[in-house]
Curated annotation (Swiss-Prot):
Cell compartments where the protein resides: Cell membrane
Source species of the chain: Schizophyllum commune (strain H4-8 / FGSC 9210)
Extracellular side: 41-46, 103-109
Protein name, per record: High osmolarity signaling protein SHO1
Xref: Pfam families: SH3_1
InterPro entries linked to this entry: SH3-like_dom_sf, SH3_domain, Sho1_SH3
Record note on quaternary structure: Forms homooligomers.
Topology feature Cytoplasmic, residues: 1-19, 68-81, 131-331
Any one GO CC term of the record: plasma membrane
Compositionally skewed regions (Gly residues) per UniProt: 218-229
Keywords, sorted A to Z: Cell membrane, Membrane, SH3 domain, Stress response, Transmembrane, Transmembrane helix
Superkingdom as given in the UniProt entry: Eukaryota
Domain named SH3: residues: 272-331
High-level lineage: Eukaryota, Fungi, Dikarya, Basidiomycota, Agaricomycotina
Amino acid sequence: MPPRGNEGLDFTPIITHYLFLFTSILAFIAWFTAFIGQIIATARWNGPVGTLWFAIFLHLFLILGVLYTLASDSLATHRFQISVFGAVALVFAVNGANAGLYAEDGALNAMAAGYLILAIVDILWLLFFTAEEESLLFHLFNRLGTGGLTPPSRRRRARSVHNMAPANGYASGGYGAGGGISSHDVATGAYDAKPVSGAFDARSGTASGAFDNKSAGAGAGLNSPGGGARSQHSLGGPTTATGSVHSPRGEDGTGSPLMAQGDMSGAGTSGEFLPKAKALYAYTASPDDPNEISFAKGEILEVTDKSGKWWSARKADGTNGIAPSNYLQLL
């Protein structure tokens, strides 16, 4: 689901996710019961509730905070705060249940029943908001429905990609398909940044971006006297129809980013075995991240990079992209 941000609230995740639908209804009923019980008990006994007045309003703001987090699809942003205040609220809920559960007053009994239900809801919410995506609990909760919520790790990764893109030119054409390297890209250190969409595949030795001879040459000589002539000479090799730069073999080594595509293919993985992974669950790529790939449950993928929580993989039809590692199992 695309991040909603300031585009408004959508309560569909609460309605379609059975866990949140059930716990939200329970939380409101329990809070109202405990609140009315506290009011009556305070009016009758003038003060047996004490600090539970703080607890009842803490639970109110916790419930509203959970609903806002789900409706705004901001798990990655608010899960830590919700977990902290949820743990504090759980302690107060247990104290509230203990304060009136065995009392001989109906109002205190109602208050205790409300806090007991709130404690159960607090535990379920804590288990969800503190569960990592690789954990069994996260998968069990997702079996009740994802609600279209963005997983926390994908949300963080998507933000880092979007924040990085304008700075180094990768997402705007620096290394994108058919994009050329401008002098701005070279001057700002575009070579040192991590590509967004994997324009250069180190395993297959192919490059999807085209290099602009003039702009790359101009940028390469910004920091050295006479650099313009030198860079034009180093980039003076013939250019193919696809825009790849063929530099003289004697000047650019195998580690040069200006290496010819034909030379790159020699460093490929001819005959190299790529590990395969089986999809444990069906996955639909996020529409706001073009790097992700969708796959069906049981589909076999070739894994080209196993580092991190998001693996680079290739489908049987040749589609390349990234996939969440917790959805895959190596064969």
